[in-house]
Amino acid sequence: MSIVLIHLHADLTGTEESLTSMHELFAKLWDGAPEVTTRDRALFSIAVAEIAANVIEHGRERYDDWKLDLKACDDHLEASIRHPGPLVAGALTKWTMPEESAEGGRGLALAAAASTLHYSHSTDPEGSEWRVVHALAC
């Protein structure tokens, strides 16, 4: 069973400014888990930031807020991003890189390459949840 070193929560708005708040939360996470390597920090941060950017970009017209939980455990990092939006089109399909000429569609593929992604949707008020899990290097 994993030992939780630090668990942080933030209620964020659906604006790009919330990405700054997210990075401030990352700084607090790393302060509470200084043993996490730079590589693990970078991979986890990339995955979470890509999902958060998608939530903001695609949810802008439908909802104003989202919730972020960050957790550092002795053997993994974990993030939960929840928003009240509807099922995200394409979220349940395989996340692969688009063709080089594509103008978008790389966010989920980058996140999946950096860490393990889980997506769930329910009809409760929480709506959709993205979970990012990153196993720490031994």
Q: Language-model segments: which ranges?
A:
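Glycine-rich/acidic phosphate-handling loop/turn and adjacent ATP-lid/helix
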Residues: 76-105
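Short strand-connecting beta-turns/loops that link adjacent beta-strands
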Residues: 73-76, 124-126
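Flexible, glycine-/charge-rich segments associated with ATP-binding catalytic modules
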Residues: 1-17, 112-138
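Conserved short strand/loop->alpha-helix "switch" segment adjacent to the catalytic nucleotide/phosphoryl-transfer site
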Residues: 27-49, 100-102
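Glycine-rich phosphate-binding loop
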Residues: 101-115
